[in-house]
């Protein structure tokens, strides 16, 4: 169509609407899934009007059907129900409005819903959205708590009352939203994103007081699960539910079984904390007292030792021992010196008695030839040979006379 138009040769609105209607007619009948809203069954009217909505994308389309088509499922289908309709798209050219004319309506059973949720759960788990490593720790004492819940609901009352009872100073930033029906998902997602964007919000609680599987479907919506996974603020899921667990429980940083349980897990009890501090203080006091008493006993035992009790006595005892040993040493050394002196004198006397000088003193002389050899026999000398004679008091020369 674009090739056949220009600013100079535009198509009239009616022609464009006619072309769109032709394309829609060629689409034929299709099966469409959605959630029923704005159901209108006027008494006596042969046509039923409703809106079929996709809560994940907040897109709606009008649906009409004959009364007998709706009456076939009227007992199990009402506003908020998820259904599959076999319908033919219709284009109302005067208003440029798309609608569906349903020929068959089938409610989606609980079993089928749970099967779809299980498939979605596996898909999201495969992306790693539920792993423990992604979980963020909650602050010990949050100053400001974001609360997403229904307006004037029991869930809101339970969280606020229990939290303030445990810690009166805690503050809340409450976002009241639809917690079931077609508007629940976009409102809850928007509230979570708004609270996560605030730097002063320490933790976010998403609370609802339970319900059927159909009522809790918004808390298993993929859009909400991904929004919570993207939060930088810790998120607590507090959906009081049946055994079938909403997917919000898996992606949240902490799961609480009920709104009351969420208040207890998020906010510490001031009384319990004061008692815990008191108990720790008493325990510390007992530990310190025990250490002091043990050290005092050790010190008393040490002071009771003789060396510490009367240190001078030990010194005096050792001084007497030193004096006794010193005197003993002197006596022993004196005896040794006296004996050594006596032995030395005796040895000296023997040496003197046996020395040549002693012999000379008795009148003997030593004759030596000129070469210094001592004369021992007469035949060792010749006539007129000069010899040197050594006596006790000196020496002189003699001549041999044969």
Curated annotation (Swiss-Prot):
Catalysis: reaction(s): Exonucleolytic cleavage in either 5'- to 3'- or 3'- to 5'-direction to yield nucleoside 5'-phosphates
InterPro entries named in the record: Exonuc_VII_L (IPR003753), Exonuc_VII_lsu_C (IPR020579), OB-fold_nuc-bd_dom (IPR025824)
Subcellular location: Cytoplasm
Enzyme Commission identifier(s): 3.1.11.6
Keyword Cytoplasm: yes
GO cellular component, one term: exodeoxyribonuclease VII complex
MF (Gene Ontology): exodeoxyribonuclease VII activity; nucleic acid binding
GO terms (BP aspect): DNA catabolic process
Disulfide bonds: none
Record's keyword terms, sorted: Cytoplasm, Exonuclease, Hydrolase, Nuclease
One Pfam family cited in the UniProt record for this chain: tRNA_anti_2
Family per record: Belongs to the XseA family.
HAMAP family: Exonuc_7_L (MF_00378)
Function text: Bidirectionally degrades single-stranded DNA into large acid-insoluble oligonucleotides, which are then degraded further into small acid-soluble oligonucleotides.
Subunit structure: Heterooligomer composed of large and small subunits.
The name this protein goes by in its record: Exodeoxyribonuclease 7 large subunit
Protein species of origin: Streptomyces avermitilis (strain ATCC 31267 / DSM 46492 / JCM 5070 / NBRC 14893 / NCIMB 12804 / NRRL 8165 / MA-4680)
Biological classification of the source: Bacteria, Bacillati, Actinomycetota, Actinomycetes, Kitasatosporales
């Amino acid at each position: 169509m674009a090739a056949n138009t220009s600013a100079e040769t535009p198509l009239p609105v009616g022609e464009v609407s006619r072309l769109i209607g032709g394309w829609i007619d060629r689409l034929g009948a299709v099966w469409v899934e959605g959630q029923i809203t704005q159901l209108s069954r006027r008494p006596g009217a042969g046509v039923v009007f409703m809106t079929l909505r996709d809560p994940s994308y907040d897109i709606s389309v009008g649906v009409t059907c004959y009364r007998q088509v709706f009456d076939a499922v009227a007992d199990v289908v009402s506003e908020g129900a998820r259904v599959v309709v076999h319908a033919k798209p219709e284009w109302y050219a005067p208003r440029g409005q798309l609608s569906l004319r349903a020929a068959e309506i089938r409610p989606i059973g609980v079993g089928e819903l749970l099967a779809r949720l299980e498939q979605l759960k596996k898909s999201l788990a495969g992306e790693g959205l539920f792993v423990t490593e992604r979980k963020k720790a909650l602050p010990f004492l949050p100053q400001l708590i974001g609360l997403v819940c229904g307006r004037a609901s029991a869930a809101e009352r339970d969280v606020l009352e229990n939290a303030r009872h445990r810690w009166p100073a805690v503050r809340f930033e409450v976002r009241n939203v639809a917690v079931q029906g077609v508007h629940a998902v976009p409102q809850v997602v928007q509230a979570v994103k708004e609270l996560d964007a605030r730097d002063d919000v320490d933790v976010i609680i998403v609370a609802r007081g339970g319900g059927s599987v159909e009522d809790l479907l918004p808390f298993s919506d993929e859009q909400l699960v991904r929004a919570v996974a993207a939060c930088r603020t810790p998120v607590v899921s507090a959906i009081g539910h049946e055994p079938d667990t909403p997917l919000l429980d898996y992606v949240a940083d902490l799961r609480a079984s009920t709104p009351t349980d969420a208040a207890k897990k998020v906010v510490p009890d001031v009384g319990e904390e004061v008692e815990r501090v008191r108990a720790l203080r008493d325990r510390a006091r007992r530990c310190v007292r025990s250490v002091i008493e043990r050290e005092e006993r050790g010190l008393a035992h040490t002071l009771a030792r003789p060396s510490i009790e009367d240190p001078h006595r030990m010194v005096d005892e050792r001084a007497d021992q030193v004096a006794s040993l010193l005197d003993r040493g002197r006596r022993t050394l004196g005896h040794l010196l006296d004996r050594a002196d006596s032995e030395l004198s005796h040895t000296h006397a023997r040496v003197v008695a046996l020395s040549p000088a002693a012999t000379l003193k008795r009148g003997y002389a030593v004759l030596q030839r000129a070469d210094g050899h001592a004369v021992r026999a007469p035949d060792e000398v010749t006539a007129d040979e000069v010899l040197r004679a050594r006596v006790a008091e000196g020496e002189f020369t003699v001549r041999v006379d044969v």
